[in-house]
């Protein structure tokens, strides 16, 4: 069951009006998630352009996650519009498109963590760690990413059959659909168990070594596992427990309908608590749109502070492409007069530097230059 389907009907459980809660949730939390998520996505994208990650393999996976997240975040305002106006904007195509990338975001965020953990676990399983190369890791990761992309695309296309417009409102798949339980199993439970097993195996393997392989970043992997447990676990557990909201209502509530609205009443306060918990846990679950990319960027070594300085400098001054730390080289590259160089349009010949005492230039000889090599050496 997806919590976005809750605001399509007027829902009252005893004295608790769940409709107002869900409307406020969608308008506030989805708006905040959109702005924060897009800002972080843009920031990490610029970080990748300005400074390549230290770990190219994790950087490759992080880029795939950022692309899916960006498309999913762009569609979130459509749900805010539906919550505010009670109708869907964009037609049947945009409804299915939003549902497809919302589903793909669930799988890509969680399974990308599996790929990163698998890469480090596979390296630790090698008998000779010196044989591990970046090229081999990249090829292996590309193969795993290709398989994952096919799986995510297939499930995303399958979600098109579960997403449709009814009464001018977009309905995602709900608990009575097989896809809802598949999401709970393959979208969270199975990948999280795989991550936990591999991390435990890595810890046991490294405890037997005489040195500490810090490149594994085991502490960050454990934080990643803990983040997925806290953010994704409550929502998928409660969603699988409640099932379809329609069947949940039919089992636990008395259905009253009229020509204007459809309302649900029941005196048991526990049902209102379950609806409120479902909304709150879903708000926690969508934090994966920026929590997972931040963790992956940390593993990739983006160095956010360095990138932030480059971004602020970009806004204030022109950035030179060359490294102009040496003042003499700076003048030469800018075409300014330099007393140590004979500058001409075709070539630049190096003149021997004269010492204050009139002696020979021993510094150039120490560097391996003699007069014959200097006469034959030219730049350009």
UniProtKB/Swiss-Prot annotation:
Disulfide bonds join 95-170. Keywords: Disulfide bond, G-protein coupled receptor, Host membrane, Membrane, Receptor, Transducer, Transmembrane, Transmembrane helix. InterPro entries: CCR1-9-like, GPCR_Rhodpsn, GPCR_Rhodpsn_7TM. Residues 328-380 are annotated as: Disordered. It is found in: Host membrane. One of its GO terms (molecular function) is G protein-coupled receptor activity. GO terms for cellular component: host cell membrane; membrane. The keyword Magnesium does not apply. The chain crosses the membrane at residues 26-46, 60-80, 97-117, 145-165, 184-204, 220-240, 275-295. Belongs to the G-protein coupled receptor 1 family. This is G-protein coupled receptor. It comes from Elephantid herpesvirus 1 (isolate Asian elephant/Berlin/Kiba/1998) (EIHV-1). The lineage of its organism: Viruses, Duplodnaviria, Heunggongvirae, Peploviricota, Herviviricetes.
